[in-house]
Amino acid sequence: MLNQKQTDCRFGGVAFAAGEDLSLKTGYLARLNAGGDLVLPQGAAEITPYVLTQGADQGYLCGAVPLTSAGNCRVKLAGTCEAGDLLVAKGDGRVEAGVSGGEALPVGTAEEKGVDGQAVLFRPAMIGSVTVAG
């Protein structure tokens, strides 16, 4: 019989220890490392399912929001974008305007015009596919 209890599942904001100094990285994309700590990505192809909402020094709790198409969020922009542009991972936790099919991982769609350094409003979206070797 299927156990339908979901009492250990969380929706909304989460807190994890910072795996590196994230004190000035609010609004950046992040991922969990093997130790279960939040860290910035090391490249544009890494999957980053969180946006930092409260940075912290290494080892301290920081806040994050999981990316979901059910709601928009703000993330740091590198360069400029127009509303409707596809935003892709830059590889350092920021996003930039890009195209589908490039090497960078698509993250979502800009919902407003943005300038460099702005926390741009965007709608996360599952775009593209990932090939699993094996």
Outline where the language-model segments fall.
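Glycine-anchored, exposed beta-strand/edge motif detector
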Residues: 1-134
